[in-house]
A protein has these predicted regions:
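Bacterial Sec-dependent N-terminal signal peptides
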Residues: 1-24
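Start-of-domain marker
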Residues: 22-89, 100-102
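Residues in well-ordered beta-strands of folded domains
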Residues: 29, 76-78, 93-95, 120, ...
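Short, charged low-complexity intrinsically disordered segments located at boundaries
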Residues: 76-88, 122-124, 179-189
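Internal, conserved structured core segments that host functional sites
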Residues: 108-180
Length: 211
């Protein structure tokens, strides 16, 4: 009986070691130095943890990544208060690097700043994202997850592109799908061609259609 139990535990351990890792190893920092002191700052610690979980625990692709192949990325969300309850504007800085084969070095693949951030977040709010229904029930709340899902796909796309021409197209198309179905209204910007020449629309459009 003990022998059977030991064999079972060994097989379970071997199986767990073979499970595919998620694609991203993301660190998220939520900077609230420009948020009003009247706001409960503990909510942003909760948000930071929720965003890390959202990026790292979700399976973004059907590909298999070994633990040492995960894409290292840092996202800094800089927020400031608005006149609306639980609504914030600001920017996000996205940096990512991939491991260099057979070395301990990382090769940078993304360094980008997005100044078109407008989100709604209430502490302990569930971060829900459905790529078939990007807009969700509340545009501003959905804009938060749409924003991070978009950059998750862009990061994965640039990683794949670094290995082969057009290697990231499938993921850039996922990002473009978010653009095409993004939340709108409530002063949300960055998803439309007319929102400026440097935004999420043009980033996806240019990488897919100008090569």
């Amino acid at each position: 009986m003990k022998h059977s139990k030991s064999v079972f535990l060994l097989l379970l351990l071997m199986a767990s070691q073979q499970l595919p890792a998620q694609e991203l190893q993301a660190k998220v920092t939520v900077n609230t130095t420009r948020v009003s002191n009247n706001v409960n700052k503990s909510a942003f610690q909760t948000l930071q943890s929720a965003l890390i979980s959202f990026l790292n625990n979700r399976k973004w692709t059907g590909d298999t990544y070994a633990q040492n192949e995960k894409i290292q990325c840092n996202l800094m969300l800089n927020l400031e208060s608005t006149d609306e309850l639980n609504v914030y504007t600001g920017s996000i800085i996205i940096q990512a690097a991939r491991p260099v084969f057979n070395s301990a070095y990382l090769s940078p693949i993304v360094n980008y700043k997005d100044d078109n951030v407008r989100i709604k977040y209430q502490e302990f709010q569930q971060l829900e994202f459905n790529e078939n229904r990007v807009t969700g029930n509340d545009p501003l709340s959905s804009n938060l997850t749409a924003l991070f899902a978009y950059y998750a796909y862009m990061i994965i796309g640039f990683d794949a592109l670094s290995f082969a021409p057009h290697g990231g197209d499938a993921y850039f198309q996922k990002a473009q799908n978010i653009v095409n179905n993004a939340p709108s209204g409530s002063n949300i910007s960055g998803w439309k061609a007319f929102d400026g020449i440097r935004n999420r629309y043009w980033l996806a459009e240019n990488i897919l259609n100008t090569r």
